[in-house]
Regions:
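Nucleotide and nucleotide-moiety/phosphate-recognizing core
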Residues: 2-164, 171-172
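Short, charged, intrinsically disordered terminal tails
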Residues: 174-177
């Protein structure tokens, strides 16, 4: 059942340079990474937004909002997602962290001050619209580190099961899933 008042943002962009092909289209069981993430967000959120680069022409079964920048960094997708969200609270997940669960995302949302993230870094994370001005400023100034952009905000650290946070950057990483 979806949580009323929670937006889910799926970051489907990324150059996939080390991987060699779009990570969003890698299969895990019967689903691609993108399909799985979209489903998990749908289990939790009453609104879902996928953000990427329109020029990438990614073939996924849902609309992808162009992040509106030439920047290839997660901060661009987070800003675009927060701007488009109709809710004040958003969970943001990258497509290349395919083992995330509804429960893990719910824990991030429940703990969110301005931001809630695991100790490993700013994604996945929960972001309130109160974080948007700091993120927009960092992006406008070319400061592309999401971790640095949230440093001055009220950030909750949420310990999650590390096995859920496996990031797939190379074909060998898929075998660890």
């Amino acid at each position: 059942m979806a949580h009323h008042g929670l937006t889910g943002v799926l970051l489907v962009g990324g150059a996939s340079t080390r991987f060699g092909s779009p990570k969003a289209l890698v299969r895990i069981g019967d689903e691609t990474f993108a399909e799985r993430a979209w489903r998990v967000l749908g289990e939790l959120c009453d609104e879902r937004i996928a953000v990427g680069k329109a020029a990438d022409g990614l073939e996924v079964p849902f609309a992808v909002l162009d992040d509106g920048t030439d920047v290839r960094a997660p901060i661009a997708g987070v800003v675009a997602g927060l701007r488009a969200a109709r809710n004040a609270l958003t969970v943001v997940i990258p497509v290349d962290v395919p083992l995330l669960t509804r429960e893990a995302l719910s824990a991030l949302a429940a703990a969110c001050l301005d931001v809630a993230v695991p100790p490993s870094g700013p994604l996945p994370g929960a972001y309130r619209t109160t974080a948007l001005p700091a993120l927009e400023l960092a992006l406008a100034e070319g400061r592309l580190s999401l971790r640095a952009a949230i440093a001055g905000l009220d950030v909750a650290t949420v310990v999650l099961d590390e096995s859920l946070l496996i990031n797939v950057n190379a074909p060998d990483d898929v075998r660890r899933l």
